[in-house]
């Protein structure tokens, strides 16, 4: 609902629609259904609300008060949210008075101070084995639930060093290359848009005219999550989600303008509609990354979206139709 309210008034161009339907954005959790119950969903909702409050038409102090009081709660829900703070700083800098940079930086530092104190407190107070046992027993006593993977990771990966060791023990050249290609293809429409975007007024001490450089700087911290998480599919989804939401905010509020080269995709859609639709289908619904670093690329995303949605709404109880058919066997053996 928040996402719909945010994107419904966007300026229309074909490439933006393609970027929204990237398989590493809103289609990803529908293909990998377990992602819908992950903590990052709360981060996405919190960030969308921040973007709505950050509209130039609204009072600027509203978004700053929101950051001061709500962002620490998001950090308590999931600590790695701190890696995505640069997107917030980027938006606050754009909304600030460019002629009062020092004052603007002070305000941003002040509204983020609560988040920095929260993350420092979390770092210096890691979860002890005794506290983990209390939590584990509480899950069983109150909800009848065992301490499964996410709960046990709070114990085995409570230190910062343990976060990085898990990745180093699982990384392979194949996995690295696979996710490089995933990001290259998944980000391709958005990066074309960003490359062809220009600020309507010069940004940050009048040094930046194009969006590409400041946006690339914003991505430096989130990319570090690849060294601390083995769920690389989720990392790609989170980085892309924050990236495209930020871009959509800029274009929705008329803070950037697009180069006419982007209109080529509108021309391509009008003149070669059938070819364009086929390519769009393959790009958006033909594949998606798996959750784990060792997972291969999934296919038949559109089928999985329909199957997973129907299974949970109609209670199919995980019965797979046609699982022994020659077509499915051929797909598993030669395509997947």
Protein language model regions, located:
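Transmembrane alpha-helix segments characteristic
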Residues: 203-225
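Aromatic- and kink-enriched transmembrane "portal" helix at the membrane-lumen/periplasm boundary
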Residues: 19-45
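Transmembrane-helix motifs of polytopic, lipid-linked glycan transferases
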Residues: 1-11
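Short hydrophobic alpha-helices at membrane interfaces in multi-pass membrane enzymes
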Residues: 56-73, 102, 106-107
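Perimembrane helix-loop-helix junctions
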Residues: 84-113
